[in-house]
Amino acid sequence: MTTDEGAKNSGESPTATVAEQGEDITSKKDRGVLKIVKRVGNGEETPMIGDKVYVHYKGKLSNGKKFNSSHDRNEPFVFSLGKSQVIKAWDIGVATMKKGEICHLLCKPEYAYGSAGSVPKIPSNATLFFEIELLDFKGEDLLEDGGIIRRTKRKGEGYSNPNEGATVEIHLEGRCGERMFDCRDVAFTVGEGEDHDIPIGIDKALEKMQREEQCILYLGPRYGFGEAGKPKFGIEPNAELIYEVTLKSFEKAKESWEMDTKEKLEQAAIVKEKGTVYFKGGKYMRAVIQYGKIVSWLEMEYGLSEKESKASESFLLAAFLNLAMCYLKLREYTKAVECCDKALGLDSANEKGLYRRGEAQLLMNEFESAKGDFEKVLEVNPQNKAARLQISMCQKKAKEHNERDRRIYANMFKKFAEQDAKEEANKAMGKKTSEGVTNEKGTDSSAVEEEKAEGHV
């Protein structure tokens, strides 16, 4: 029997029914949030902390007066569970629901809007009634590109997160499909997980986790083991992976402001070498992390001695050039151009910077800009044969691009002309038909008039 049927049979309002029969779903068991299932949902899975949930709802005061409804707006309400984006009662109640479920919640003021209320619709210390339908839920898109989806099984402690270079101790379980291929405790440095056969998606996720947090990570190939796969674990190229990760402890690396210039320069030399090792191994995202550290440490460093300034500029120039090469490999051409711009800001005649920017712009179909960069390369080094070949490629690609555009526009104009001709033909046909009808009517009328005239004579 549904709650509505129960309410009708007993003559009680839904609010009274929940107050009498509702299940206390609070951790304190203080009857602050009572729940009755109106329609059973599908399966056994419920939303986790951080999941994006989609609901329809109706909200009423205890006297039955409606104060809000997503149905009136004809669109679902969306929020992230467990992130304090809604009242406490919702974070508690929606976490117990299954997809497709409809429930009634009765929420005491301390789990709703408290003594403040929410003027003008909700008075102070109001007990609220909600009917909620859980339409859908999905994990948190950590990087907003769909590559790492997190579902939090257990919320962490505090507000601090590991940073790049932090030492972490984690427990992990890795699965590909139904098969578990990895299960262990491991300590490593964030950004260097590859050295321990850990995919970069875990490094990225750890920077958003708190101590003792337990989560499930769904990694796309880009953040897993990529095109190379992982033969050691029997992972095929471009496989999607699932990891369950618990962050047991961590020690943050020094932030930039905690390091003096000498330490930054020393560390820059170390991470530059690490980045080069990753790059040569085809681990371009790992290399980006290392070269990026140099930029974060030195780009805004001021008050340096002449010797320090020269060393800093050398590290930054190398970092920007190497980042540009990494982004070219990762097919992130806009970022490659940005890094080349930074490098050329330090050395406007840098041959590598000009060439790599030209490469990126050629791949972005910016043929004239690319050609200009390759021509500048020849001004710096007339012996650069690769730049000459690239200029020819720019000219060829530009010609092909223009010819393709001409064909597209020619076909487009042809279709427009055919459509116009067809419309004109239809208009002409309509006019001719109209005139034919008029003439026919005119002839008939004339004949009648003639007959009448003859009759009168």
Swiss-Prot record:
The modification Phosphoserine is found at residues 13, 445. Inhibited by both FK506 and rapamycin. Residues 1-26, 421-457 are annotated as: Disordered. TPR repeats lie at residues 268-301, 317-350, 351-384. One of its GO terms (cellular component) is nucleus. The modification N6-acetyllysine is found at residues 28, 155. One of its GO terms (molecular function) is peptidyl-prolyl cis-trans isomerase activity. It catalyses: [protein]-peptidylproline (omega=180) = [protein]-peptidylproline (omega=0). Its main location: cytoplasm. PROSITE patterns: FKBP_PPIASE, TPR, TPR_REGION. Pfam families: FKBP_C, TPR_1, TPR_8. Immunophilin protein with PPIase and co-chaperone activities. Component of unligated steroid receptors heterocomplexes through interaction with heat-shock protein 90 (HSP90). Plays a role in the intracellular trafficking of heterooligomeric forms of steroid hormone receptors maintaining the complex into the cytoplasm when unliganded. Acts as a regulator of Akt/AKT1 activity by promoting the interaction between Akt/AKT1 and PHLPP1, thereby enhancing dephosphorylation and subsequent activation of Akt/AKT1. This is Peptidyl-prolyl cis-trans isomerase FKBP5. It comes from Chlorocebus aethiops (Green monkey).
